[in-house]
């Protein structure tokens, strides 16, 4: 059952709520069934007593109105189907309906922002990405998702498993929005681009673990990746790989592959310090970054941020980056 992220540090800008149905974070991770496939968006879940457990009833929060998917932190627009509207019983849809993906995008971006706020950002620490982000469900069959800093919006693709059916794809893209809010234009070098991809993967794992923990947390996008991977478990990428800097950089450079160096360092920080302290340090450090920062320089700034939390934290963060060749 997804955990409702709340607490005294969460800033609630608007009060409207509504019932909804989502995957948490996705059927493969949730049910532990690696043989699930897309089947052209068919809803084969509802009629099966085991598979129907992949659907979770949740409460959408921070809505401007309980009638539509627009709120304090996200506004959803569909370009390939009718816009989701409250049916009277809430936003209860199944995966064969385009509206299900819209609900997923709204819920998981809101949960990501609420998690960040629960760490103190916006209260005891500067706010991070506390703005309304637009989300477009379109791409007309393209299996790709991306964040555009020029428009401050996220586009989620519909090729293969529709990207918005996997919470970790949604939150990964939100990670780019987070970094753009902290450092305008972030990601203008190969290293900075890799940091962006690595952080997106890590944030996806961090948020999904906070809301709906699963056994294999280090596997990113278990459901979306069933359309383009043959190995089991199915993962877009993992955050517990073995790559080091600079010997394992891709040639030519490829930010997603190189991002696995950064995400592993963040994962090790999490294992050493625990989720909440690690995530606070990781996110807070990004205020010190520059648009074209190198991985070693970003590691140095993260270590400096960790020092604010005491010598044990600084030592653990230094060790995590040293293991990746970054300190």
Description of each model-found segment:
Residues 1-170, 177-327:
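Zymogen propeptides/activation segments of proteases
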